[in-house]
Amino acid sequence: MCGILTPDSGNCIVNGMVPYKDRKEYVKNIGVVFGNRSGLWWDVPVEDSFELLKEIYNIPDEKYKKQKQLLTEMLNIKEIIRTPTRQLSLGQRMRCEIAAAFLHDPKIVFLDEPTIGLDSTSKIAVRDFIKKINKEKNTTIILTTHDTGDIEALTKRIILIGKGKLLLDGSLNSLTKKYSNKILNVQYNGKLPTTMPQMEILEKSKNEAKIQIDESKIKLADAINFLSNNLEIQDLEIKNTSIDNIVANLYKEYKI
């Protein structure tokens, strides 16, 4: 989709162009960030990399000045852009990488693992920027990530691809409703029933159990009533299934 590789088979059209065939024109309107590969020049100040990108993308002086100011403020990098890239922490560098990808105000930005290896503070800063720029500039963000925190914080639409085929295309809300079963952490006196309709015991110890219920088949209230009628419940905690489990269920269903 970035136009770097030629496909073995099939085709891809983005903004009316075939990325690898129309690469020179195509790259004018896209930005790319690779989590494990820097797009900045290593031994020079970040600002010098920005200046070089300005020339590469032929960004007018006024537009460059305005865009640079906007991005340095939004990503809080004003104090570090005069520092050589190699001297930056991973979180600082990633914020500068993202700024570089947005300098020419692209219509589409591909972010490959943008939060990989970042601490919690840096992850939040990157995610907040992505949400804000998407809302304010209507920039299309295509995100590839193994961090389910990114999925939960940023995603409106999920596309699942396996073995070269589109397996699923839907909203995060619809997926959550379909796959998000409730987890009941129960502390009790007595003995767990041998049969519990539409409920699965995930973990069990002497007087505690973690029970998953399928809300497409049984209501939460009915499940709790069943347990209350068969056990002396000391404590009950209700949790939603994590995004990790939802993704695992998708992989299982589509045999990826």
Question: What are the residue ranges of the model-derived segments?
Answer:
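Conserved ABC transporter NBD signature motif
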Residues: 10-21, 25-26
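Conserved ABC ATPase "signature" region
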Residues: 51, 55, 62-80
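Conserved ABC ATPase signature
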Residues: 84-88
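Conserved catalytic motifs of ABC-family nucleotide-binding domains
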Residues: 105
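Catalytic Walker B motif of ABC-type/P-loop ATPase nucleotide-binding domains
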Residues: 109-113
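ABC transporter nucleotide-binding domain
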Residues: 127-214
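Short, charged/small-residue-rich alpha-helical element at the C-terminal edge
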Residues: 183-256
